[in-house]
Each structure stands twice: as C-alpha cells, then as structure tokens.
Amino acid sequence: MPSPSRRAALLGLLPLLFLAACGTGTGPRAGSGSGAVGAQAVGDSTLKINTSPEQNRVRAGKVDAIAAKVPAGIRGGGELVVGITGDGIPPLSFLADDDSTVIGVESDIAQLVADVLGLKLRLDRTSWENLFLAVKSGKDHVGFSNITVTEERKDIYDFATYRVDQLAWETAKDSKITKIARPADIAGLKVSVGSGTNQEKILLDWDARNRKAGLKPVEVQYYQRPADYYLALKSGRIDVHFGPNPTSAYHAAVSGDTKIVGTVSGGGESIQGLIAAMTQKGDGLVQPVSDALNTVIENGKYAEVLKRWGLSNEAIPASQVNPPGLPRQKK
C-alpha cells in the first residue's frame, strides 16, 4: 500500500488516466493541497478530479414507485449496505487523500442507486474475496466493485448492469513485448492475475488453447494487491499483468514504469463483458436496483458520474438484469 505522501503524488497525476484511455493530450498539471486535482484539458472539455474526502457527489431524488419495490427487510432498515473494495487504484474504488474515505466511480454509482431507493448509503469496505461472501450471506445488500457478470456467478447472485468491461495487458515499460492480441501472444509468458476474477477465466482459457495447439504454457501467478503485482512486474518475476483497463491505464500513466500492450472485452472474444451491481440470488433487490440505474441513466445523473471519473466510454444505454455473462469455463 503506498504511503500517504506517495498516494498524494499519484493522485495528483490522476488526469493522465483519461489521456491514456483516450490516447490524446499532454501531461497533467498538479492541483493544490486541498485535494482538488488541477484541471486537465481532454478534447474540448476540462476535467477536474476531486480526491478529497468531501466528494460533493452527484445526487439523485427518490422515486417512490421504485423505492416501494425494495424488499421490506431492507427498506425498513433505512440503509443500503454496499460491499466495496477500497484499496484499489483510481478511478474505480480507492481511498481519498485522508487515507480512509472510499471514493471513485463505484461509490458514486452506489450513491445514486441509494438515493433513488430512498435509502442512506453505507459503504462496507472489504476485500475482493470477502465481498462475495458478504453478499451471499446477506451481510451486504449489494456489491459495487467492478464485478463482471459471468454465467457461474449467476448461479449464486443476481446482477444489474451499469458499465461495459474492458481488460488490459500491462508490461514493464522496457519490455520487448509490444502487442498482445491473441492467445499465442502470451505463450510461455509469466502472467499475473487476480484470483476469482473474470480476467483469470480468460487467461486460463487462452492458456488451454495454447496447450492444445502445442504452444508453451503460461506461468500464472496470483496477486491481489496492486503493490505486490507491480513489484513483481518491476523486478521481472512476471512478464505481464492482466487486469481492468481503467486501473491499468492509470498506473501506466502515473508511474511511467509500465505500458499497455493490448485490451480485450471483459467477456472474452465471444461476448461484450458487462460490469454489474451484485445482489443475493432471489432476494428481490436486483430489479429495483436495475430500475434505479435506468432512472439515473435516463435523467443524466449517470452520465455526470461517468464523465466525472473519465469513464464516459464505458457507458451503457440501459441496465439489464442477469444478461448473458462470461461463458462457463470448460472442464
């Protein structure tokens, strides 16, 4: 985990993420110590990122007809308890410059949903692994943490979509690897990935196809914390890291130590991956969550949040409940 001073330095360079994602522009201008990062021109607009704990989030109004659909047990408690990972990299879910407040696009979308449902948002900061257990047990009502819809996850959870999912292949800046676009490109490489993620499924599928074709197998290494896999990448213990495109693009831009050599849909080659809010299977919450998402998509609040975090290119036209997900892994 970066120190507070290192975190501040990284967050001060946050606008670079959006330049990396768009492939345009020049370097950023750091902001003041107040936590409001300096302006950065992107196309014809100027983007300002607030990394202070006082987020002034985009808010939405309650919609009584949708709020009435929330299961009575949750509605009666007056809170929407959202499981979220808070130790990641911008712009998804990360800590503000007070090193304790969870901010990012995930918590902002969760706030909009809670508003429409007439509930107070309570964020439950947890690990990636514990997030699934917390939702399954009912400890958390819903998970917002860059979760991709998969067919296997749909056996246990319900999903309401709110973003498209793109993944990136990230290498050291001086790596001889220049492009990863097909399974053969990773044959024989040492690749890190998060356990239990959709990118792990894609990686294992590509490796299986390589083995079947007689190519060298991938050496898969598992890391959950960014500090760990980036140290492994820098030291040469791994050749490539495979993770979410927004966070990888951010790291490549602000560190100067890595580069993006390819991207792929979070659903693999057969389907466009979709990021979704995750609820307990059959508990009745997923439909009002989806309705709330469609409300803020239609009234423009959703677009405001995505624009705020530089993720307008990951917008969807409508939220769906339990759409086709990443295919089951063949055994």
Question: How would you name each of these model-derived features?
Answer:
Residues 31-145:
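Extracytoplasmic small-molecule ligand-binding "clamshell" domains
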Residues 120-185:
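Acidic, polar ligand-binding/catalytic clefts
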Residues 35-65, 115-116, 177, 197, ...:
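Extended ligand-binding regions for polar small-molecule ligands
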Residues 147-154, 203-205, 235, 239-271:
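A ligand-binding cleft/hinge motif common to bilobed small-molecule-binding domains
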Residues 164-171, 253-291, 312-331:
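Periplasmic-binding protein-like
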Residues 18-21:
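C-terminal motif of bacterial Sec signal peptides marking the signal peptidase cleavage site
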Residues 87-89, 100-116, 147, 165-225, ...:
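Bilobed "Venus flytrap"/periplasmic-binding protein-like clamshell domains
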Residues 23-26:
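Bacterial signal peptide processing site
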